[in-house]
Amino acid sequence: MSKFAKFIKFTEMLSDAEKELGIDHLSGLDKRILYFLEKASVAGNSMSFEELNNVMDTPRATLYRHGQTLVDRGLISKQKDPDDGRRNIISVTIPVRIS
């Protein structure tokens, strides 16, 4: 199988997975936000919007706008840090979609 054919197969698999999770309608930036939050979660870490902004090197206003849209859609949650009330902890909360 050629490298291009492998790429096409991978792209199709990724597209199917996005549809299954219900995130196929999201922008590239939204998917990157979810990626970094999930990566932090798997490592046992939490992230704030400020920390996410530092990692992603995205304009703050853009990141906050996309982040709030993801909160409104129920894909991420935002909660006050119990140790620092000024900090909001954000995490992935993608609901399971039952077909």
Protein language model regions, located:
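Short helix-to-turn junction characteristic of helix-turn-helix DNA-binding domains
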Residues: 37-41
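Short, cationic-aromatic polyanion-contact patches
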Residues: 25-29, 48, 81-99
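Short coil turns linking two alpha-helices in DNA-binding domains
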Residues: 59-60
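Short alpha-helical segments that sit at the start of domains
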Residues: 4-36
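A short, conserved structural fragment
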Residues: 71-81
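Short acidic, hydrophobic short linear motifs in intrinsically disordered regions
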Residues: 43-54
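Short, hydrophobic-biased segments on the C-terminal half of alpha helices
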Residues: 67-68
